[in-house]
Amino acid sequence: MPGVSARRLSHEERRQLAVNLTRVVTLYRSILDAYIIEFFTDNLWGTLPCSWQEALDGLNPPQLATLLLGMPREGEVARYRSVWPLTLLALKSTAYALAFTRTPGFQTPSEFLENPSQSSRLTAPFRKHVRPKKQHEIRRLGELVKKLSDLTGCTQVVDVGSGQGHLSRFMSLGLGLMVKSIEGDQRLVERAQRLDQELLQTLEKEEKRNPKVVQTGPRHPPHHVVRWVDPTTLCEELLLPLETSPQSRARLLLTGLHACGDLSVALLKHFCCCPEVVALASVGCCYMKLSDPGGYPLSQWVAGLPGYELPYRLREGACHALEEYAERLQKAGPSLRTHCYRAALETVIRCAQPELRRPGVQGIPRVHELKIEEYVQRGLQRVGLDPHLPLNVAALRAHQAQENRVVAFFSLALLLAPLVETLILLDRLLYLQEQGFHAELLPIFSPELSPRNLVLVATKGPLGEAFSLLETEDN
């Protein structure tokens, strides 16, 4: 999907982008704020302009992927069956033009061509116990952190919200960085320490089997700390150096791989207020968990704009997987009917118990193999209602016949979702610049593998042309 590069924008252009984003989000708030499971109960299709309904009605999933989301299959040419209204074309063009580009600036052969489960860019010891998505993420972010550390003269990397320690382990034992790993869950830390020891033993065995491999110095596994990082207070542990040197002060680089909600905000605030922290590389996620207020907006500029507010539903939608859904649309698989079935179930729930709105429904296996009435019966049971309630099967079948409309409305919301994510991340960029620091956003992961793929990079001093090194991929 095309978009705008944050790197190519001046400070004033970034501020103007925030103005444009708040205007557009306000204009299409009714779509962004809608819950797809209320498609029938709230007549969401009827909220669209009639001309939009005519243009979108009857489009099959692959056509939606190509014409609306702008993601045709390779070699496919977009062919419109009718002239779309200018307002719908404007929505599409605006969504493309104002969202940060999610395509990395480098193009390399897929690391999973030979084996979909094993990255060809990571050695076997670092792939063990690591899912393909995470293999891709730790390699890309780890290599960027290594370059950023070298450019800024950092003496220590602090990985916040480190989980099982996969990123910390790669940075320390794979890239030779001094790493402190901070995680609030004791069980995850204990598992990380076990994996550290397992990897160390594997590397030692490899050295014995292959004497030509020369280890240049002692290996330093990550130093693990069990600690919750409170976004509202300074975490002293985060700032303590691993090694004290009387000659120089510690220079810290903070990083977080998909630091959840306010944890990403905590990294920004520690970077801003602590002189020991000279660099930051943060990939955020779970925007709906941001404190309101406190987590957004951070910048004075965005806070002063009319329409800046992003309620829970909009922030939840910003955690989109646009590329993955477009691929599902192109395949037109039966799993696409899940939203339609769930929306039909909501109509039955409201009739049976009107005060019960949007209850969570535990996963119903193999939905696409069920008749809609069978799905509704299982869904009723999962929300604590009588599964043998009399059902209007004709009404349910009429809902099922609108499956493509449900998919079309969801696709519209998904088209707009990157604008909300862009506004959240742009607010963080502007916040850092308001504090007098240098900040950029880079697409670092393949969006098909990792939807939250934009890394916020910040430094206390300018990097100049050297910053371009962070956009390249190691051979």
From Swiss-Prot:
Assigned GO CC terms: membrane
UniProt KW keywords: Coiled coil, Membrane, Transmembrane, Transmembrane helix
Listed transmembrane segments: 406-426
Subcellular location: Membrane
Recorded coiled-coil stretches: 186-210
Membrane topology classification: Single-pass membrane protein
A Pfam family: Methyltransf_32
Signal peptide stretch: none
MF (Gene Ontology): rRNA (adenine-N6,N6-)-dimethyltransferase activity
PANTHER family according to UniProt: CGI-41 METHYLTRANSFERASE, METHYLTRANSFERASE-LIKE PROTEIN 25B
Family: Belongs to the METTL25 family.
Protein name: Methyltransferase-like protein 25B
